[in-house]
């Protein structure tokens, strides 16, 4: 499934937060004590989040916590020496789609899977409502060399959020 990366691969996770989702992803990708040899580069802007991620990494070899701004990958990109096949972004900043496209162009392999968790409330949108925002994001992704495999409304879990499952084709 495109929603999960291949076991033992290297993934980039932008907007790692306190590590709840990272912990579940780690179990799949790395296995107990990293028996699969996977690696998660987990980037977050908040020092409090990094503290929690660093604590989590002590018991999870292969988890690399990074204090950094997802928009400024020149500052932390050296920690991702090769392109990845799977990238997940869950940042609460305006310009989410631009951050995602830039990161994917820099770090995601062609034919790689990129997941964008888009929060409508984080955008400075002056258009005709959330549906128009989500449609404009789809258009921008397609125009930037991504195929949209699926868009999943997260209503009931996270209101006003859509998860875009994309494949980089250019």
Predicted feature residues:
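Glycine-rich helix-loop-beta junction characteristic of Rossmann-like nucleotide cofactor-binding loops
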Residues: 1-6, 80-81
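C-terminal substrate-binding/active-site "lid" region of AdoMet-derived donor-dependent transferases
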Residues: 51-55, 101-169
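Conserved SAM-binding motif I beta-strand of class I
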Residues: 36-44
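Conserved class I S-adenosyl-L-methionine
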Residues: 6-19
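S-adenosyl-L-methionine
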Residues: 43-96
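Glycine-centered, small-residue-biased loops immediately flanking beta-strands
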Residues: 9, 38, 112
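Conserved SAM-binding loop of SAM-dependent methyltransferases across substrates and taxa
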Residues: 18-35
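A short acidic, amphipathic alpha-helical/loop segment
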Residues: 24-28, 99-104
């Amino acid at each position: 499934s495109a929603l999960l990366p291949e076991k033992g691969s290297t993934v980039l996770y932008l907007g790692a937060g306190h590590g709840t989702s990272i912990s579940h992803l780690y179990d799949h990708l790395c296995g107990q004590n990293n028996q699969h040899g996977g690696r998660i580069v987990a980037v977050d802007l908040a020092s409090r989040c990094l503290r929690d991620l660093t604590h989590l990494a002590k018991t999870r070899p292969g988890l690399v916590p990074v204090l950094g701004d997802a928009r400024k990958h020149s500052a932390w990109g050296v920690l991702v020496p090769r392109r990845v096949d799977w990238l997940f972004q869950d940042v609460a900043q305006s310009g989410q789609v631009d951050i995602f496209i830039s990161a994917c162009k820099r770090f995601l392999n062609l034919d790689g899977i990129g997941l964008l968790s888009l929060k409508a409330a984080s955008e400075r949108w002056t258009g005709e409502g959330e549906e128009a925002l989500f449609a404009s994001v789809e258009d921008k992704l397609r125009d930037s060399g991504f195929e949209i495999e699926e868009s999943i409304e997260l209503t009931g879990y996270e209101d006003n959020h859509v998860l875009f499952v994309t494949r980089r084709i250019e």
